[in-house]
C-alpha cells in the first residue's frame, strides 16, 4: 500500500513539474532561433565591427586629401632687453608669437586617390565577409538546432527500447518461474536491460549537452522549446543551375574578387611612390614683444610650395612595388582556387542531399519492417515459438532502424540548408522564408531539465519507468 502511495506521489510530482515547465518555456522555430542568434552572437558583432573598422579606414584615407590646419603659440621671457651699439634692440624683455598654419601634401601620381579607392573596396569586402559569416553562422545554428532535435529523438528511442526490454524482462522472469526458461535467459534479459538504462543515461546527458550548446550559440534561455518543421522531400538538385547561382551570389567569391581588385589598386599605389611629392603651405602669424623695436613686424601672411623627390631609398620603393605585384598574383590564384573549390562543394552538397533523400525512403521501410518483425517475434516468444536470441536480434534491428531514420531525416534537412549555403542562397532563403516549410503542431519537443520525464509521460511510459523492478 505504501509503495503504491509513493508511486502515485512521484507521478503527481512529475506531472506538476511538467506543467510548470510548459507554462514558462519559450517556443522557437528554426527561423526564430536564426533571428535571436544573429542579434546576440558575439561572432556576428565581431564581423559587424570589421565593417565599421573598414569605414574608419576610408575616413583616414579621405583625411589625406584635406588640408591640415595647425594652430600654434609661444611666449618667451628674457632676463633683460639688449641693444647694439647703434641703439637698436636685439633682445626684448619678453616676446610672444601665435598663428595658424595650413599644410597639404600630395603625390603627382595622385596615389592618395588610389588609397581612397582601396579603402572603399575594403568596405565592400568587409560587407561581403559579413554576409558570408552570417551564412556560416546560420548553418552552424541549424546544425545545433537539429542536434537538439536529434538528441531528443534519440532519448525517445532509448526510452522506447527501455520499455520493450523491461516488458521482455518481466516476461522472461514469469516464464522462468514456471520452468519454461532457464536462469541464463533471465541473466541475458537483465544484462540487456542494464545496457538500455546505460544508453538512457547517455542519451539524457547528450540532450543536455546539445541544449547547452544551442543556448551558448544562440543566446536562448535554458528552458526553451523547439518547434519542429516538416520539410518537403520534393526538392530537386540541379548541379549546373546551383553552380551558376554560386558564381553569381556567393559572397565569399565576391569578397575574393574584391580582394583581387584591391591588390591591383595596391600595385598602382606602390607605383606612385616613384613620383615626386608636392607640399603646399599657408601661414598667418601674429607677434608681440616688449619693448617693441622700430623694425618689429607684428603680423605677416605668407605661403609656399615644395617639391620632394626621394631618388634613392636603398631599394625600398622597388621592393614594395614587387611585393604588391606578388600579392596581386596571390589574390588572383586564391580567387581561381576558390572558384574550383566552390564547384566541388556544390556538387558534394547536391549529391549528399540526393543520397539522403533516396536512402530516407528505404530506411523508413526498414523501420516499418523491423517494427512488424519485432511484434511478430514477441508474439512467437510469448507462445514459445521463438528464442531469447530471436527477440534480441529483432529488438536490435528495430533500435538500429529507429536511429537510422532519425539521423537520415535531420541530416537531410541540414543537407538541404548546406546546398543553399553552397549555392549562395541561404541568406535570401532565411530572409524570405520557404513556402515548402510548414509548422508541425504534433512535433513539439520540450527541452527542459525534466525533458526525460516528459518523454515518458507523452508516451504513456512514466508509470512504467517508476515501476521497473529487477530484484
Place the predicted regions along the sequence by residue.
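Bacterial N-terminal signal peptides
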Residues: 10-19
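Amphipathic alpha-helical coiled-coil segments
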Residues: 46-61, 133, 137-157, 167, ...
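Transmembrane beta-barrel architecture of outer-membrane proteins
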Residues: 95-99, 143, 188, 300-302
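Sec/Tat signal peptide C-region and signal peptidase I cleavage site
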Residues: 19-25
